[in-house]
Structure formats: structure tokens, C-alpha cells
Amino acid sequence: MALELSDVKRIAHLARIEVSDGEAAQTLTQLNQFFTLVEQMQAVDTTGIEPMAHPIEQVQAPAQRLREDAVTEPDRRADYQQCAPSTEAGLYLVPKVIE
């Protein structure tokens, strides 16, 4: 997928971003390089490769890996909501400010 200069200018217009011709040309080059890289990655045969939950596992030492998720604090929502003027179903009720 290759973009053209008119595509970059259209995207900038839709995003309400003002870009000069030089910036548009530079952005076009960068986007086309990015799309080329994506196409190369999509061409790689990944059948039989197990997806990784966290790719960082491949570069970090075992001692620095992400810790297991565990509850470390008790649920004190009811305690915190006792001082609220109005709550319902565990949510804080606030006055309507937008008409």
C-alpha cells in the first residue's frame, strides 16, 4: 500500500492539521516506509508460532519480568462512599451540569 501526496494532504485536511508542501512530502516518505515495513512483517510465515502474551519476556532478565497480578488492597469502596452525599449501586451520583 503506497500513499500519494494527495492522500497525505487529504488526511491532514480531515484531521484539521495544516501542513506545508515540504512537511507533506516528508510525512509521505515516512508513511510509505512504515507501510513497507508492515508489508514485510505480514509476509513472514508465522504458522505454528505461539503468540506471546508479553513480548518483553524475550528481552528482560527473569528477575525483571512482570509480577503476577494479585489483589494487594482490600475492597474499601463502601467505606469511601460513606462520606459521599449521594451514591447508587457503588457509584457516586453528581448533579447534572450539562443541559
UniProtKB/Swiss-Prot annotation:
It catalyses: L-glutamyl-tRNA(Gln) + L-glutamine + ATP + H2O = L-glutaminyl-tRNA(Gln) + L-glutamate + ADP + phosphate + H(+); L-aspartyl-tRNA(Asn) + L-glutamine + ATP + H2O = L-asparaginyl-tRNA(Asn) + L-glutamate + ADP + phosphate + 2 H(+). Its EC number is 6.3.5.-. The keyword Iron does not apply. SUPFAM superfamilies: Glu-tRNAGln amidotransferase C subunit (SSF141000). GO terms for biological process: glutaminyl-tRNAGln biosynthesis via transamidation; regulation of translational fidelity; translation. Disulfide bonds: none annotated. GO terms for molecular function: asparaginyl-tRNA synthase (glutamine-hydrolyzing) activity; ATP binding; glutaminyl-tRNA synthase (glutamine-hydrolyzing) activity. Allows the formation of correctly charged Asn-tRNA(Asn) or Gln-tRNA(Gln) through the transamidation of misacylated Asp-tRNA(Asn) or Glu-tRNA(Gln) in organisms which lack either or both of asparaginyl-tRNA or glutaminyl-tRNA synthetases. The reaction takes place in the presence of glutamine and ATP through an activated phospho-Asp-tRNA(Asn) or phospho-Glu-tRNA(Gln). Belongs to the GatC family. This is Glutamyl-tRNA(Gln) amidotransferase subunit C. It comes from Ralstonia nicotianae (strain ATCC BAA-1114 / GMI1000) (Ralstonia solanacearum).
